[in-house]
């Protein structure tokens, strides 16, 4: 996925997060209120390539909101091409400051099980050097951990992953996926397709 396209998509992503995640405790619907339409509450735009806390902004593919802390979590899927795979934290209060863009409060490098940043395709060496294609991110309030997905590096044999990380980006564990998420090419092609596997993630 291209850097610019995802930065433009930030408008829709943030708007959806406000609607679905909620910035305040949801009100109980009154009797007879069945209007379940999604409404645009606010929008913001941060241009691709803008330097944010020492990193180039862009490739934002996932976002989640923690109503207890009032903090947003965002993840970049630029495959470590412009900076190591990373997550951002942000604050945004469009109801109080409708003209103000989100305030990016932190950036954290996602780390491998060995405690190293994920390499870019150019930096990758060896069969075990995974290049992630991060897509979704969710805050697990009960565990105080982040869950994030990677579609894998198909051209180099990488497979989809579901991972748990500490809020500062350190690896916590890989969460096993069903065998159907492991692609095979021989004797016939089975499993997910490139750029079409773990796009989203939700708790239920």
Predicted features by range, described:
Residues 23-204:
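Sequence/structural signature of beta-propeller domains
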Residues 11-21:
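Bacterial N-terminal signal peptides
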Residues 2-11:
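Bacterial N-terminal signal peptides that target proteins for export
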């Amino acid at each position: 996925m291209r850097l610019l396209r995802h930065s433009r998509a930030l408008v829709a992503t943030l708007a959806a997060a406000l609607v679905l995640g909620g910035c305040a405790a949801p009100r109980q619907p009154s009797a007879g209120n069945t209007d379940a339409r999604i409404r645009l509450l606010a929008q913001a735009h941060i241009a691709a390539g803008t330097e944010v806390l020492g990193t180039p902004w862009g490739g934002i593919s996932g976002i989640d909101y923690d109503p207890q802390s009032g903090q947003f979590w965002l993840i970049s899927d630029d495959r470590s091409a412009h900076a190591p795979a990373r997550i951002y934290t942000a604050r945004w209060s469009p109801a109080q400051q409708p003209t103000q863009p989100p305030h990016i409060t932190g950036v954290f490098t996602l780390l491998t099980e060995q405690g190293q940043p994920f390499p870019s395709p150019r930096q990758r060496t060896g069969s075990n050097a995974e290049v992630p294609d991060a897509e979704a991110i969710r805050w697990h309030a009960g565990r105080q951990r982040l869950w994030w997905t990677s579609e894998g590096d198909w051209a180099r044999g990488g497979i989809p992953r579901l991972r748990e990380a500490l809020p500062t980006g350190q690896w916590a564990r890989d969460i096993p996926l069903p065998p159907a998420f492991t692609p095979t090419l021989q004797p016939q092609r089975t499993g997910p397709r490139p750029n079409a596997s773990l796009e989203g993630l939700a708790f239920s």
